[in-house]
Curated annotation (Swiss-Prot):
Key component of the proton channel; it plays a direct role in the translocation of protons across the membrane. It is a multi-pass membrane protein. NCBIfam families: ATP_synt_6_or_A (TIGR01131), PRK05815.2-4 (NF004482). PROSITE patterns: ATPASE_A (PS00449). Keywords: ATP synthesis, Cell inner membrane, Cell membrane, CF(0), Hydrogen ion transport, Ion transport, Membrane, Transmembrane, Transmembrane helix, Transport. The keyword Ion transport applies. It comes from Rickettsia felis (strain ATCC VR-1525 / URRWXCal2). The chain crosses the membrane at residues 29-49, 84-104, 114-134, 140-160, 189-209, 210-230. This is ATP synthase subunit a. Belongs to the ATPase A chain family.
Length: 242
């Protein structure tokens, strides 16, 4: 199974740790999430530790990323969304760096595992729920009954809206994990055929691999953006009840 396209997603224990009967071992997934966090912190430290009136290219790139997240919150929530910039920005950067780090050879893509993406999605879900109840109290429950719903249809609508609400973390996490896994499997399969194809098609497979890698990098960035924009939309539901 060492050459299986799915072998790249195997979880491997590096340090076996047991706490209170639970397995909390340090794995290859853990080390790549830690590495992604360190790289992100290093990137923004180098970009902002010596800010100048005429910014460097590194500072400009960091400011573009920050403004992208700030604009997402502003467009979806408005001024009230500014207080959530640290949370949403951290989510976007963590997912982005995990996705991009997984593109390097012989690395591991933490966001291809549902347990990682589901944990991030649950964080968003709990934040939205807590914010909704803190801001609106029991009136937050009106989210599950659209305005103007006929009384006879209310029970059915409440069930549908509640199910939709509870399904948010599942859909949010599955979308990210499935896209990252599918892209890496495709690259692995095509890379396996590249050497054989070069015998018959000369150098044609090489540009194809470059195009696919470029597309996968685009998908990695896009999936981080989609996860973040959906999180902003869910926060908007909690802050501005409709």
């Amino acid at each position: 199974m060492t050459h299986s396209p799915l072998a790249q997603f195997d979880i491997k224990k590096l340090i076996d740790i047991k706490m209170f009967g639970f397995d909390v071992s340090f794995t290859n997934s853990s080390i790549y999430m830690l590495l992604a966090s360190i790289l992100a912190l290093t990137y923004f430290y180098l970009a902002f530790y010596n800010r100048k009136l005429v910014p460097s290219r590194l500072q400009v790139s960091a400011e573009i990323v920050y403004n992208l997240v700030a604009d997402m919150l502003n467009q979806n929530i408005g001024v009230k969304g500014r207080k959530f910039i640290p949370l949403v920005f951290s989510l976007f950067i963590f997912i982005l760096f995990c996705n991009l780090l997984g593109m390097t050879p012989y690395s591991f893509t933490a966001t291809s595992h549902i347990i990682v993406t589901f944990t991030l999605a649950i964080l968003v879900f709990l934040t939205v729920t807590i914010v909704g109840f803190v801001k609106h109290g029991l009136r937050f429950l009106t989210l599950f009954l659209p305005h103007g719903t006929p009384l006879w249809l209310a029970p059915l609508m409440i069930v549908i809206e509640l199910f939709t609400y509870l399904a948010r973390p599942v859909s949010l996490s599955l979308r990210l994990a499935a896209n990252m896994m599918a892209g890496h499997v495709l690259l692995k399969v095509i890379a396996g055929f590249t050497v054989s194809l070069m015998i018959y098609l000369k150098f044609l497979p090489i540009p194809l691999m470059v195009i696919l890698i470029g597309f996968e990098i685009f998908v990695a960035i896009l999936q981080a953006y989609i996860f973040t924009i959906l999180s902003c939309m869910y926060l908007n539901d909690a802050i501005n009840l409709h």
